[in-house]
């Protein structure tokens, strides 16, 4: 199992797990430490248990072993934020056009979804950049054909939710929150989920869908109960204050 230990340590640290947590009841902490340093071997069945303990699929692990590099889709996501937050519509248009060319060349559906995501960001900056109903339907189909949502899908939803109908926001929000395997033990993913649900909550309040709003408020209270993140808790207080304002102004 050459290099397996080193790769396992990479994923363990990436996902924020201690040696003790990763070892669990599958192996001793010292055995796992030696395995990561390449000093001993472990059985295949034990190895699969360890991967499960740190929430890493065999497919992702194998990809990493094959000199896994950051994918073009990761590069795409990384380039979006600085252009969006600087209101650089020209930069976003360039990214969208590049993704469209890749779609036309390869036929890969995700490139088409990427162009819609960028169009959604452009729409947030300038409402003259319209996202068509057909494009939104493509996104809906894509999401509910995916058996497992990862950070890409949550980011996609977070960038387009303002265009969704309220019933659909509630639906995808429930789907996200019920897929606890995605965010329960991984801090980065949990932050994405909290951010998305804060936006869903605010959007439901804005549109006077109080039953849906109450659902997201209840879930967020549980998610943030033991959280030390100041920004998320401050945002929660802001939306909570907005709810009080709406109630008192009626």
Over which residues does each language-model region extend?
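A short, Lys/Arg-rich alpha-helix, primarily the initiator
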Residues: 1-14
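"A position-specific structural signal for the A-helix of alpha-solenoid helical repeats
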Residues: 7, 78, 114-125, 155-159, ...
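Short alpha-helical DNA-recognition segment
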Residues: 16-33
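DNA major-groove recognition helix of helix-turn-helix/homeodomain DNA-binding modules
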Residues: 45-60
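Short, charged recognition helix plus adjacent turn
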Residues: 63-90
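Start-of-helix signal in alpha-solenoid helical-repeat scaffolds, especially tetratricopeptide repeats
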Residues: 73, 109-116, 148-155, 187-198, ...
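Helix-turn-helix repeat elements of alpha-solenoid scaffolds
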Residues: 85-98, 127-137, 166-178, 207-218, ...
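Amphipathic alpha-helical segments of tetratricopeptide repeats
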Residues: 97-104, 138-145, 177-184, 215-226
């Amino acid at each position: 199992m050459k290099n397996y230990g080193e790769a396992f340590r990479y994923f363990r640290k990436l996902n924020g797990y201690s040696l003790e947590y990763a070892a669990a009841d599958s192996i001793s902490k010292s055995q796992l430490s030696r395995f990561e340093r390449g000093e001993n071997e472990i059985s295949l069945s034990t190895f699969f248990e360890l991967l499960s303990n740190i929430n890493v699929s065999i497919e992702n692990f194998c990809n990493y072993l094959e000199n896994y590099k950051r994918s073009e889709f990761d590069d795409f996501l990384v380039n979006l934020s600085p252009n969006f937050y600087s209101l650089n519509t020209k930069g976003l248009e360039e990214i969208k056009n590049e993704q469209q060319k890749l779609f036309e060349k390869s036929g890969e559906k995700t490139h088409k979804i990427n162009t819609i995501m960028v169009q959604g960001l452009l729409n947030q900056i300038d409402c003259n950049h319209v996202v068509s109903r057909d494009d939104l339907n493509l996104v809906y189909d894509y999401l509910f054909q995916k058996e497992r949502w990862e950070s890409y899908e949550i980011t996609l939803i977070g960038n387009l939710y303002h265009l969704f109908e309220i019933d659909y926001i509630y639906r995808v929000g429930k789907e996200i929150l019920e897929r606890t395997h995605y965010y329960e033990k991984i801090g980065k993913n949990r932050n994405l989920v909290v951010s998305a649900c804060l936006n869903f909550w605010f959007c439901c309040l804005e549109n006077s869908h109080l039953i849906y709003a109450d659902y997201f408020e209840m879930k967020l209270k549980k998610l943030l109960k033991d959280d030390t993140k100041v920004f998320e808790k401050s945002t929660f207080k802001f939306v909570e204050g907005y709810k009080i304002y709406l109630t008192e102004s009626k």
